[in-house]
């Protein structure tokens, strides 16, 4: 979990209940900052999840507030996290495969050096581009971050869908010469 805002954790109880209804038995590990995990547990507790019959094990792994290198190493991938600048404590992520492919996810953030560190040389940067409000990044700033990090492809996520697609893409392309896409349901990269 990158941070505790409703649009990022609000469906967690539904997700866990769905797994339980499907009779999951294998343990689930949820990673995040201490403050995020504490609030996530409070959210889950509203639904009495620990008392559901035959509930599968859930473990919470706290990511250090300063970030963590390779805090997940499983299934041919390594995941690292760094703090980014949002309205609440938030982490961005870097996923590296054993084959050398790299995807970075900024999460909700203002432009900051840690986004560039996470995305350094990445194949893909998933960069939020909600606009210039505090704690967020504009499409133009997303292009600047992608260029500074030397990524191959920029995918704008968490963007304002009231703004024309051509305007969003055009703003990012002013600053980044690589491929720029808008994230959409069922997008294959």
Predicted regions and their residues:
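Cap/insert and terminal regions of metallo-dependent hydrolase folds
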Residues: 110-189
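Binuclear metal-dependent hydrolase catalytic cores
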Residues: 1-105, 169-189
